[in-house]
Amino acid sequence: GILRQCIHDGFGLTRFGETLSGPEYAQRFIDEAREAGIEASVDTTVIGLDRDRTVTAVSRKGLVQYQADAVILTMGCRERTRGALSIPGERPSGVFTAGVAQAYINLKNKMIGRRAVILGSGDIGMIMARRLTLEGAKVDAVFEILPYASGLPRNIQQCLKDYGIPLYLSHT
């Protein structure tokens, strides 16, 4: 999932006592699951869950059913779309969600532009401001609708202040 494209560190300090990149962090959990004998199904869509905990799914193997003692629903996450954020207009060229920008840069080695502004001061927004700067882009500013930054103080320092990227609060 999303951890593959998070090549920056900052994961795992609480759980593993060291700072890891997204792929390293994910691999730790994969290793733990394998060691515990946990079977995982990827590229699989659950299409039914009965009261008796019979799970019906579709995968490359076809239609499969599992009888479970317990079911843990892990739906994953998705970025909110431009429409969900009430950003008006059509799908303009050069406007990316942070996840899409991160995938282009970190997984596909494609730069999304030479100048950028970031809307939102969450951790991923600040990390992307730094990443774009490291890749040679000019990040003019990070804009935050709230009167305070929503990311961690360390990211304000390491991603914005250290690179001279201004943060404008109460702005959109």
Q: Over which residues does each language-model region extend?
A:
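Residues forming the flavin
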Residues: 1-172
